[in-house]
Amino acid sequence: MATKAASSSSLPKSGAISKGYNFASTWEQSAPLTEQQQAAIVSLSHAVAERPFPANLVHEHVHRPENGLSVSVEDTHLGDSGAIEAVLVNTNQFYKWFTDLESAMKSETEEKYRHYVSTLTERIQTCDNILHQVDETLDLFNELQLQHQGVTTKTKTLHDACDRLLMEKQKLMEFAEALRSKLNYFDELENVSSNFYSPNMNVSNSNFLPLLKRLDECISYIEDNPQYAESSVYLLKFRQLQSRALGMIRTYILAVLKTAASQVQAAFRGTGGNKTSVSEGVEASVIYVRFKAAANELKPVLEEIESRSARKEYVQILAECHRLYCEQRLSLVKGIVHQRVSDFAKKEALPSLTRSGCAYLMQVCHMEHQLFTHFFPASSEEVSSLAPLVDPLSTYLYDILRPKLIHEANIDLLCELVHILKVEVLGDQSARQSEPLAGLRPTLQRILADVNERLTFRARTYIRDEIANYTPSDEDLDYPAKLEGSPNTTSETDLRDDENADVFKTWYPPLEKTLSCLSKLYRCLEQAVFTGLAQEAVEVCSLSIQKASKLIIKRSTTMDGQLFLIKHLLILREQIAPFDIEFSVTHKELDFSHLLEHLRRILRGQASLFDWSRSTSLARTLSPRVLESQIDAKKELEKCLKTTCEEFIMSVTKLVVDPMLSFVTKVTAIKVALSSGTQNHKVDSVMAKPLKEQAFATPDKVVELVQKVYAAIQQELLPILAKMKLYLQNPSTRTILFKPIKTNIVEAHTQVESLLKAEYSAEEQANINMISIQDLQTQLDNFL
């Protein structure tokens, strides 16, 4: 055992062993055995616990002789098969033999283990050498990897540097190209200058427009980059060249336009100066066809200018071209237009002149717009472009119409002019959405405004003279004879039909004039203007009718005056109903009355004139107050009509049942006096008597009262209804007006009947013989 321990302790320390052990431990931990596997290992360990001797061990053969112990041992140690044979005689020899045998066996076993240890040591050494070589190889690989990484890093750095250099090269090339392209704009100055100042350069040259375009590009670029060195100097020089080029264009256009105008005038004179050629059509007229052909070379230049109209320089030159064009066109057509309008004024009346003149100007404007569109297609929708041409032409018509309008006093003719301008002329333009005629619209609207102003003035004068200040004649106030002599045909609501024109003869003239005037003005004037005129007309017409009613009362009867007023107010109310306006006007006026008290305080020394800090200072109270008052002519008309109807109803009621009303009033007074508890005993004794014993209420008096009322119903009410029918042709109107009269009559009879039943006996009631309420209502209904 000592030898074995010594052998094991003599094993060298090896990295292979530790690494193998660590690997085995890791393996054991990483791959634990199951219980079944562990049981199998235990079984195997028990099975191999007692190993048999190796085949090369010594085989012993023990022979027992007859006279002693014989032992034969065969040793095969290290391949030697020698035999140890000994004859054991005594114990001592046996012990000696056994000791030798034990030593031989131990020696043999130790030799085997030594050989195994030696072999294991060699293997361990070999493994250590291999591990050492592997470590050295790994170190070499690590060093090689580090060197590779270094080479890779250097290579990547080199590649990055190359890429950076390529990018810098590309940027420098792009910068150089950009710098070259930017410098080209500055370098163009010399090229453009030499071309523009060349004696052979003119607008008709094929290189002129490309040079102008390049010049504009240079100016735009320098304007967008003012930070460049000497940019202001170059910009100034480029602008000078641009001004020169635009001046050349202006001169060229003016020369071509004048040449074209001269050719047209020469051709026009060659035709004998026919003044009517301007109205014969666009394509056939020498003024348009020749001018278009003569000036056709301007079209490319004008199109270039219009395409650059976003720049202010070209806006100015384009406006100048428009002006030059309009001047030349005006010089050609103004004489013809003026002559034609003058011919219209000499031959035609004002409405026909307005219609013909507007139609002629519309035709001329249409042709001029077509020609203008040929040269300036992009500017054709701008109304102001042709204004220098259209305004003078339309002024010729305006100058001829205005003096005639100022002196025109006929409202019908002025209304006709409004219709012509608003419907036939301006309305026709709006319907067609005609751009060529848009330039004529301001002048037409100006003429229409003058006509409206004149019409408004004449309408106010007419209202003042013919309605408000109307002086009626005896024939105008001859009512009811005027109604009795006319056919009773229509009602108040059917007065606008032509077949009922005779009914106007029964009207009071201011009413007919008011309605006629308003019906004419309604479609002609603006709503605000018409509202003011309508309110004024209705107000003064109502006052005029009221004045006439008072005069009729003096000439005829009160009832005639009332019915006259009711009739005409009803007609006026019904006839103004279709006008979709408010007959109210708000009047504003300044009120300085509040300053009086403040001035008094200043004069008394109680306030200061220049005390700016106080609210009572004159400066603070100097501003006037604005007072607003609203006048509604329609409401005033309704109020007057209602008052007149109530007066008529009460007058008829009193005329028929006045005795009954007086009787009821006296009875009521007696009852009130008795209920008030007066102190006059003498009077109380008189009033305390029964009603039928009163002097005014005896049965005979009541009989007389009833007969008097019944006679009034028969004799007075029927003529009143006949007169109502004469004044008021509409049955529904008469029914509405008679209904409260009937109600009042029935109410008076009802009150008297109640008193009779309460105060008189049945015999007395029979003697009085008062008509029943039902019979009375039937009788009154039959009157209608």
From Swiss-Prot:
Secretion signal, residue range per the UniProt entry: none
Entry's Gene Ontology molecular function annotations: protein homodimerization activity
Keyword Translocase part of the UniProt annotation: no
BP terms from Gene Ontology: Golgi organization; Golgi vesicle transport; intracellular protein transport; pollen tube growth
Ranges for region Disordered: 475-495
Membrane topology classification: Peripheral membrane protein
GO cellular component term, pick one: Golgi transport complex
Transmembrane segments: none
Annotated function: Acts as a component of the peripheral membrane COG complex that is involved in intra-Golgi protein trafficking. Involved in pollen tube growth by modulating Golgi morphology and vesicle trafficking homeostasis leading to the deposition of cell wall components and proteins at the pollen tube tip. Required for sporophytic development.
UniProt name for this protein: Conserved oligomeric Golgi complex subunit 3
Organism listed in the record: Arabidopsis thaliana
Protein encoded by which gene: COG3
